[in-house]
UniProtKB/Swiss-Prot annotation:
<dbReference type="GO" id="GO:0000027">
    <property type="term" value="P:ribosomal large subunit assembly"/>
</dbReference>
<comment type="function">
    <text>Forms part of the ribosomal stalk, playing a central role in the interaction of the ribosome with GTP-bound translation factors.</text>
</comment>
<dbReference type="InterPro" id="IPR050323">
    <property type="entry name" value="Ribosomal_protein_uL10"/>
</dbReference>
<dbReference type="InterPro" id="IPR001790">
    <property type="entry name" value="Ribosomal_uL10"/>
</dbReference>
<keyword id="KW-0699">rRNA-binding</keyword>
<dbReference type="Pfam" id="PF00466">
    <property type="entry name" value="Ribosomal_L10"/>
</dbReference>
<dbReference type="InterPro" id="IPR043164">
    <property type="entry name" value="Ribosomal_uL10-like_insert_sf"/>
</dbReference>
<keyword id="KW-0689">Ribosomal protein</keyword>
<dbReference type="InterPro" id="IPR040637">
    <property type="entry name" value="Ribosomal_uL10-like_insert"/>
</dbReference>
<dbReference type="GO" id="GO:0022625">
    <property type="term" value="C:cytosolic large ribosomal subunit"/>
</dbReference>
<dbReference type="GO" id="GO:0070180">
    <property type="term" value="F:large ribosomal subunit rRNA binding"/>
</dbReference>
<dbReference type="InterPro" id="IPR022909">
    <property type="entry name" value="Ribosomal_uL10_arc"/>
</dbReference>
<dbReference type="GO" id="GO:0002181">
    <property type="term" value="P:cytoplasmic translation"/>
</dbReference>
<protein>
    <recommendedName>
        <fullName>Large ribosomal subunit protein uL10</fullName>
    </recommendedName>
</protein>
<keyword id="KW-0687">Ribonucleoprotein</keyword>
<dbReference type="InterPro" id="IPR043141">
    <property type="entry name" value="Ribosomal_uL10-like_sf"/>
</dbReference>
<feature type="compositionally biased region" description="Low complexity">
    <location>
        <begin position="298"/>
        <end position="308"/>
    </location>
</feature>
Length: 338
């Protein structure tokens, strides 16, 4: 009797459901990644555009949550991990690609749809100048309410000039909706919201799927700058580092030469400038006691010269702090770590 009851129960299952479960089971087994997206508020007719974009990369299926659960169990997935996401109308994306990159596609890929009552404008909604193709009649009063200047020409309504009917953040006027539809204007952006990804046994909620590429890029650049600074300090022997190291060593050598008075063609200017500065300082100190017969620069001139010299030193320090440019960061990564 139990077998008969089971057989009768099995006969009641529609054949299309059995085929659907079989197909879903195979898709689950052959995919590295499964993403579940919400269809609430998303126009079902827009899925074909996503299918076209992902052709060859992913398979998109709209099916009942119960059928997916059965298929997932058949494929050996612990469905309890995904149970909380299997509510409401869902779409299932099967792919062999990385879940983060696949989610990035859905984050960035926006589709347009016609406005509905209560929709807010994300950008200016403009009724363009020109022939609307609409026959003159009651529609003229609607244009009037929207403060759109019109004229009738050959029995058709013509808009005199481009007119903004909603600014970003404004609710799109209800009166404008039929006009926008007739003109083929789709002012509302929609995107498929991914709830979760299942990747090789790992459940990844939507909030953990988002990649902060700018943050990663900034961190890598900062890490490279720090590594480059260290490499310059220890004179790490690669061409892109050594040109900075040699320049720094040369500057330090000139500074030391000017301090000890070591004269070479390269250090002559620094040594003489240092000596002149010391001589002026000494002369200024004793000028009140001894008549040197030499006109000394005023305190203001001396201060200006010192300020200029200090500014140049600060500029040099800033240049050293800045380190390599963005181009040098890009080209230097390979030579420093490769």
């Amino acid at each position: 009797m139990k077998r008969l009851a089971l057989a009768l129960k099995q006969k009641k299952v529609a054949s299309w459901k059995l085929e659907e479960v079989k197909e879903l089971t195979e898709l689950i087994k052959n995919s590295n990644t499964i993403l579940i997206g919400s269809l609430e508020g998303f126009p079902a007719d827009k899925l074909h555009e996503i299918r076209k974009k992902l052709r060859g990369k992913a398979i998109i299926k709209v099916t009942k949550n119960t059928l997916f659960k059965i298929a997932a169990k058949n494929a050996g997935i612990n469905i309890e991990k995904l149970e909380q996401y299997l509510t409401g109308p869902n779409v299932f994306i099967f792919t062999k690609d990385n879940p983060f990159l696949t989610n990035m596609f859905f984050e960035n890929y926006k589709l347009r749809r016609y406005a509905m009552p209560g929709d807010k404008a994300e950008e200016e909604v403009i009724i363009p100048a020109g022939d609307t193709g609409m026959p003159a009649g009651p529609i003229l009063s609607v244009f009037g309410k929207l403060k759109v200047q019109t004229k009738v020409q050959d029995g058709k309504v013509h808009v005199v000039k481009d007119t903004v009917v909603a600014k970003p953040g404004d609710v799109i006027p209800t009166e404008a909706l039929p006009i926008l539809q007739k003109l083929g204007i789709m002012p509302v952006y929609v995107k498929l919201k991914i709830k979760v990804a299942y990747h090789e046994g790992l459940v990844i909620p939507a909030e953990n799927l988002k990649l902060n590429l700018e943050g990663y890029r900034s961190n890598i650049a900062e890490a490279y700058r720090n590594a480059f600074t260290l490499a310059v300090e220890i004179a790490y022997p690669v061409p892109d580092v050594l040109k900075f190291t040699i320049n720094k060593i040369f500057k330090n050598a000139i500074t030391l030469a000017s301090e000890i008075g070591y004269l070479t063609p390269e250090s002559a200017q620094a040594v003489i400038s240092k000596a002149v500065a010391k001589a002026y300082a000494l002369a200024t100190a004793i000028s009140g006691k001894v008549d040197l017969g030499v006109k000394l620069p005023s305190a203001q001139q001396t201060q200006t010269q010192q300020s200029t010299a200090e500014e140049k030193k600060e500029e040099k320090k800033e240049e050293e702090k800045k380190g390599p440019s963005e181009e040098e960061i890009g080209s230097g990564l390979a030579s420093l770590f490769g």
